[in-house]
């Protein structure tokens, strides 16, 4: 339990960050264990509402893999994956859209509203927010990628104090629905908005030099270092698309991207408002970030 003096120290440490980030947009990708465990779910929701109350503009993008699998099982549809991507035939696409847009999205909206925020649920189809196209592999079905982002509906909402909650289902020019990786959607939305931060909640501590040893966490790195870690095989497996997504968003103008452990209660606040943080922060260049923050 924190003493009164500890609480004051924490608040004092947070002050420069509160001042620096007021009025800025943060895109938070919400997924993994933080969506499944009630206590973690509650802490994430409270953190998002806190950001809104202190003048930051949070935009939430969510996945929902476990919930999709639950409903596929109920409907006797066997989940299939290829190279880490869900194989999405027509029947599976119907379930994905029903679950992500109709259930998971509305649950998050309800929880934010109950916690004192004002959330509005969206999917990529709303306001032509995300234009999708096929990923180009017929064998994975209706798995898409982002062709373009129209941020007007998001901007209109955040300027009125609402918290957009976005599911990663979008349509192509013919109206065909596609399932798009939620990390990718979050990165592209962050870039299109010119967001201050992209934050990915994951089930790992961040980027580790040795994936078996949490003490090897890399707290900060720039684009060049991130690309080198991928080349050297230090970043591998499921972390590659996450790091690549962060690098792509930084290259398009996002100020910083964070990969943090969503299994830690209040991970968002710990990463944003403490000097040490708890995860990995990626920046375009270390020198430019230091100059911008100190200035």
Curated annotation (Swiss-Prot):
It catalyses: N-acetyl-L-glutamate + ATP = N-acetyl-L-glutamyl 5-phosphate + ADP. Keywords: Amino-acid biosynthesis, Arginine biosynthesis, ATP-binding, Cytoplasm, Kinase, Nucleotide-binding, Transferase. Substrate binds at residues 64-65, 86, 179. The record marks 29, 242 as: Transition state stabilizer. It is an enzyme of class 2 (transferase). The keyword Amino-acid biosynthesis applies. The keyword Chaperone does not apply. One of its GO terms (molecular function) is acetylglutamate kinase activity. It is found in: Cytoplasm. It comes from the Bacteria. InterPro entries: AceGlu_kinase-like_sf, AcgluKinase_fam, ArgB, Asp/Glu/Uridylate_kinase, Glu/AcGlu_kinase, NAGK-C. Pfam families: AA_kinase. Its EC number is 2.7.2.8. Pathway: Amino-acid biosynthesis; L-arginine biosynthesis; N(2)-acetyl-L-ornithine from L-glutamate: step 2/4. One of its GO terms (cellular component) is cytoplasm. GO terms for biological process: arginine biosynthetic process via ornithine; L-arginine biosynthetic process. Belongs to the acetylglutamate kinase family. ArgB subfamily. Catalyzes the ATP-dependent phosphorylation of N-acetyl-L-glutamate. PANTHER family: N-ACETYLGLUTAMATE SYNTHASE, N-ACETYLGLUTAMATE SYNTHASE, MITOCHONDRIAL. This is Acetylglutamate kinase. It comes from Thermosynechococcus vestitus (strain NIES-2133 / IAM M-273 / BP-1). The gene is argB.
């Amino acid at each position: 339990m924190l003493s009164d003096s500890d609480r004051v120290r924490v608040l004092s440490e947070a002050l420069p960050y509160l001042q620096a980030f007021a009025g800025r947009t943060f895109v938070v990708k919400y997924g993994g264990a933080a969506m499944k465990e009630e206590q973690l779910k509650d802490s994430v929701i409270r953190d998002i509402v806190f950001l809104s109350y202190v003048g930051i503009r949070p935009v939430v993008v969510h996945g929902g893999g476990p919930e999709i699998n639950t409903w596929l099982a109920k409907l006797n549809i066997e989940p299939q994956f290829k190279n880490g991507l869900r194989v999405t035939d027509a029947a599976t696409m119907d379930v994905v859209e029903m679950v992500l847009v109709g259930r998971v999205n509305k649950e998050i909206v309800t929880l934010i509203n109950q916690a004192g925020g004002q959330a509005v649920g969206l999917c990529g189809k709303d306001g032509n927010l995300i234009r999708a196209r096929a990923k180009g592999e017929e064998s994975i079905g209706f798995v898409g990628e982002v062709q373009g982002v129209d941020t007007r509906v998001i901007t209109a909402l955040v300027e009125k104090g609402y918290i957009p909650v976005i599911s990663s289902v979008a349509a192509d020019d013919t109206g065909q629905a596609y399932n798009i990786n939620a990390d990718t959607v979050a990165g592209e939305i962050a870039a299109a908005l010119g967001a201050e931060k992209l934050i990915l909640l994951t089930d790992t501590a961040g980027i580790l030099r040795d994936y078996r040893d949490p003490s090897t966490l890399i707290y900060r790195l720039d684009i060049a270092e991130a690309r080198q870690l991928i080349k050297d095989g230090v970043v591998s497996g499921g972390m590659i698309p996450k790091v690549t997504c962060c690098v792509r968003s930084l290259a398009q103008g996002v100020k910083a991207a964070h990969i943090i452990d969503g299994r830690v209660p209040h991970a968002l606040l710990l990463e944003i408002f403490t000097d040490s943080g708890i995860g990995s922060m990626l920046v375009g260049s270390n020198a430019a970030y230091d100059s911008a923050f100190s200035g």
